[in-house]
Amino acid sequence: MFLLLFLLQIIAQAFVKSSTGDFEWKMTGRALFDGGIFFSDSSRLGNGMVISDVRLGTSVRFLKNWEGKIELGYRDSKVSLKDIYVTYRRGDHMLKVGHYFEHWGLDYRLGSLRFRLMTMSVTDAVFGDKRKVGFSYIYNSRAITTSAGFFSDGDTDNIKSLDEGYVIAAQFIGRPLYDEEKLVHLGIGVRYSEHDKAEREEISFKGGAPTEVLSKNENVFVRTRITNMINQWRFGADVILFYRGTYLQSECLAAHVNRAGGENYTGKGVY
């Protein structure tokens, strides 16, 4: 199978700023258009074009150190909550609370607006996770970034029981070389989670081709189901190299699931 992809991104913003500079408000929005053509393909997947993601949101900065953001998204024929959080920043230190991605995985940390590759990697899609409600501490300087957070493992629509489980995630990023023309970025991360009753009974990892053209149901080429889970660890490492317009990105993620009455599961992905 060979897949030819293209991506068109449309971004719009509107700003309002106070004369004293202590208040700033902006509306944000974007739409991602994806197209794909499959050839030399034995699976007979269809060609097509889709609007893969639409976002509409607003963000505000106030009282010098406070920022807030609310964003909704439309994808797969439904509206969903995206980033909804408040941050307090003082110098290199920041506290963050709300609904957002935990500190895990390179593409999830960047978000679709800042993807350097055309789509999210298969590794991130399989071993990453969705946004969760939680809080975190972040230290960010020119040379290093460290972060740690505690998150609920439940869904924001609260359709499941209240025994949701939890996630603890931490990450360290070092930039030994960083200027306008050169960057060396080295990151490591760890994540521990305990889950609700339904996920303890069965959890799955699945992935497909790196494209938004196919529906989620048909774009599954690898699937692993694990039963009788006790808890789960995930580990990650990533590297970014940049030199005068040349960009290289690589990442390795691994998941280890401890099971009751069965062999533990370990899965890995790299690109």
Can you describe what each PLM-predicted range is?
Residues 16-156, 160-196, 269:
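Outer membrane beta-barrel
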Residues 166-266:
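Surface-exposed beta-loop-beta
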Residues 2-3, 269-271:
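Short intrinsically disordered, low-complexity coil segments enriched in acidic
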Residues 1-16:
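Cleavable N-terminal export/targeting peptides
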